[in-house]
From Swiss-Prot:
Protein name (database record): Ribosomal RNA small subunit methyltransferase H
GO biological process assignments: rRNA base methylation
Pfam families according to UniProt: Methyltransf_5
EC class: transferase
Residues bound to S-adenosyl-L-methionine: G37, G38, H39, D57, L91, D105, Q112
Organism expressing this protein natively: Syntrophus aciditrophicus (strain SB)
Domain of life of the organism encoding this protein: Bacteria
Entry similarity comment: Belongs to the methyltransferase superfamily. RsmH family.
Organismal lineage: Bacteria, Pseudomonadati, Thermodesulfobacteriota, Syntrophia, Syntrophales
SS bonds (residue pairs): none
The gene coding this protein: rsmH
GO MF: rRNA (cytosine-N4-)-methyltransferase activity
Sorted UniProt keywords: Cytoplasm, Methyltransferase, rRNA processing, S-adenosyl-L-methionine, Transferase
């Protein structure tokens, strides 16, 4: 397999993300979204000869792909089926007190998008699912067919930032009266049909934001990310790096504000003359502006175009 190409998923911002971690021999690192193992493999290469990596993912398919790709690194890695929000517990179970770096890549993998049966892609006809862990939780089918019209409107508006959320929710509620909405293409057509003509000729498919909203809601993505930022920071050694690759404004805003909050420390009101909360800064922000893919990467991998990398360092 050519260097930099992966059959499961091509990692985004590969060099930039790994460079941001300042990998060194003997270091301990966590890839909380190990996917096909692309980022993890380079972390292990850069932390040779005795660096260690914990790879986590809720997707069983991803872990199988990562196990195969990382096999040459032998006992220098451990893979665990778990959500990155539970990183502190997983590390405690492994009796690892602190680590030198943490990486999260929040994007849906190419494999998840291309595997029609996972139900992530609006362009491939498949049963509505969208669960990162296909064995747990409610599927997109459950949400689309059982949530009230008001609940659907709130989900689509909050997590998809879709200004036509009301029209879309109404169209879904009307359509499912006749028969359950079962497939991705069926849902995509309903959403597209609910929008005025001017909304159907933009660069992205008219159902993109609705599919994003459902995926985020079903997988608790934003709450898991918030928990990971504030809990996992304490797992870092002083000088350890926390790097996160986000793919849409909701994620990027959460990462930016989370890092800034942990850099500030004090949460007292601005008009208080003396700090009463006792909270001290825990991070130093390294990337004041996020790092984006270069033109060559976007041309080679169009799915990388919206990626943003932010890094902070443990104080």
């Amino acid at each position: 397999m050519p260097e930099g190409k992966y059959s499961y998923h091509e990692p985004v911002l590969l060099e930039e993300a790994i460079a941001s971690l300042n990998c060194r021999g003997g270091g301990i690192y966590v890839d909380g979204t190990v996917g096909g193992g692309g980022h993890a493999a380079l972390i292990l290469e850069r932390s040779a000869p005795d660096g260690f990596l914990l790879g986590m993912d809720v997707d069983g398919d991803a872990l199988q792909a990562a196990e195969k790709r990382l096999m040459p690194f032998g006992r220098r890695k451990t893979l665990v089926k778990a959500n990155y929000a539970d990183m502190r517990k997983v590390l405690a179970d492994l009796k690892i007190l602190q680590v030198d770096g943490i990486l999260l890549d929040l994007g849906v993998s190419s494999h998840q998008l291309d595997a029609a049966e996972r139900g992530f892609s609006l362009l491939k006809d498949a049963p509505l699912d969208m669960r990162m862990d296909s064995e747990a939780g409610r599927s997109a089918y459950d949400v689309v067919n059982t949530c009230s019209e008001r609940e659907l409107k709130d989900i689509i508006r909050k997590y998809g930032e879709e200004i036509m959320a009301g029209r879309i929710a109404r169209a879904i509620a009307e359509k499912r009266k006749d028969t359950p909405i079962k497939s991705t293409t069926q849902l995509a057509a309903i959403v597209a049909g609910a929008l005025p003509g001017g909304f159907r000729h933009k660069k992205i498919h008219p159902a993109t934001r609705t599919f994003q909203a459902l995926r985020i809601y079903i997988n608790n993505e934003l709450s898991n990310l918030h928990r990971a930022i504030f809990d996992s920071t304490d797992c870092l050694k002083p000088g350890g790096r926390f790097s996160i690759i986000s793919f849409h404004s909701l994620e990027d805003s959460l990462v930016k504000n989370g890092f800034r909050s942990l850099e500030k420390g004090c949460i007292c009101p601005a008009d208080m003359p003396v700090c009463a909360c006792g909270q001290s800064p825990r991070l130093k922000v390294i990337t004041r502006k996020p790092i984006s893919p270069c033109r060559d990467e976007v041309e080679a991998n169009p799915r990388s175009r919206s990626a943003r990398l932010r890094t902070a360092e443990r104080i």
